[in-house]
Every structure is written in C-alpha cells, then in structure tokens.
A protein has these predicted regions:
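Positively charged, polar, low-complexity stretches
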Residues: 1-90
Length: 90
C-alpha cells in the first residue's frame, strides 16, 4: 500500500497547501488548487493508498475540519483510499 504522509505544518497558507498537495499526490497539471478539485483528483486514485495527516493541530479549526471531512469523504467514495490522523509530535 502506498503511504502519503501530510505534515500540516507545511500547509498553513492556503496557496502553499495546494502546492504541497499537488507535489505529495503527484496531481495533474490541471489540478484546480481548491478542495473540490482535490476531492475529484483523490477519488481517481487507483492503487491502495493510505493518507496520513500529522500535526493537524497546527491548522486553524476550520481548515482542520474541512480537510478531515474531505479525506473521510474520499475514503467513502474510493475504496482504494484510507485515511488516518497521526498523533502530534511533541
């Protein structure tokens, strides 16, 4: 299973967050750099993939909630994708 580890500390600014997603998930050139586009791209994953989000408490509450919900929705839509939160680093 492929594992993609996302560090929330590298996703504090919206524009940087989408650049980070594009790099980590090797998203296509046409990726729209918004959460709807991210959802669409992740639903197209066709190999078993585990997405791990670490340091999620570095994100503001709204962003943390939106991303967690998005990854859970992707898991419900695409059986190839699993998601888990990784305990924060001290």
């Amino acid at each position: 299973m492929k594992s993609v580890i996302l560090d929330a500390k590298k996703m504090l600014k919206k524009e940087k967050m989408h650049e980070y997603f594009a790099k980590k998930f090797d998203l296509p050139e046409y990726y729209g750099k918004n959460l709807d586009a991210l959802f669409d791209c992740l639903c197209e994953i066709n190999e078993p993939t585990l997405i791990k989000l670490k340091n999620e408490n570095a994100l503001d509450g709204g962003t943390k909630e939106s991303l967690t919900q998005l990854f859970c929705d992707v898991c419900n839509e695409n059986e190839m994708v699993k998601f888990e939160l990784v305990k924060d680093e001290k």
